[in-house]
Regions:
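A cross-family detector of function-defining hotspots
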Residues: 35, 45-169
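Short, contiguous acidic and Ser/Thr-rich linear segments
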Residues: 40-44
Length: 169
């Protein structure tokens, strides 16, 4: 004999599973969020978060300077912050002042290549070549890789295009 309660809940369960899957797909899609590095996220993390994760900076910014420099294993990191002038010029929400604008990693001896990072066939990245410099940009994800003579030298993390649109007033 069949349990009538078992069948009546089945369509609701399926619908719920589909809705949850769709919500997770949208929230974790690369076009809706920026790449982060070491727990630091553009337009979300603040200076206190950066210092908690990376330690004391090499410099103490003065005046309008809004960048911090750190030494890390394998190179150095420069973290830039959103300042009041940037908020006004880009017509951003005032609450974003003081959040991370960009993270720049300078790699000293990286062995990564475009091929080893699977960038050559990745359609999310735009490629630009100039002499011995190759740049791969993903504006939707907010990440840019710069290779010099085939080796990774710089990685830049910034807000994604969608994040910047949502950050406007």
């Amino acid at each position: 004999m069949r349990n009538p309660n078992q069948c009546s809940w089945y369509p609701a369960r399926v619908l719920c599973a589909v809705v949850v899957f769709a919500a997770m797909t949208v929230s974790f899609s690369p076009s809706t969020r920026a790449e982060s590095w070491g727990g630091i996220q553009p337009l979300k993390s603040r200076r206190i978060d950066v210092e908690r994760l990376l330690g004391k900076p090499l410099n103490e910014p003065s005046g309008d300077e809004s960048t911090l420099h750190f030494n890390v294993a394998g190179g150095s990191v420069t973290v830039s912050f959103v300042n009041a002038k940037f908020v006004v010029n880009k017509k951003l929400q005032p609450a974003l002042e003081g959040t991370v604008l960009q993270i720049v990693l300078q790699h000293e001896n990286s062995s990564d290549t475009p091929d080893s990072m699977n960038l050559l066939k990745n359609r999310d990245f735009d490629r630009q070549d100039e002499r011995d410099i190759t740049v791969f940009r993903n504006l939707k994800g907010g990440v840019t890789y710069t290779f010099i003579t085939g080796k990774l030298r710089t990685t830049r993390y910034s807000a994604s295009a969608d994040q910047l649109v949502r950050a406007r007033k």
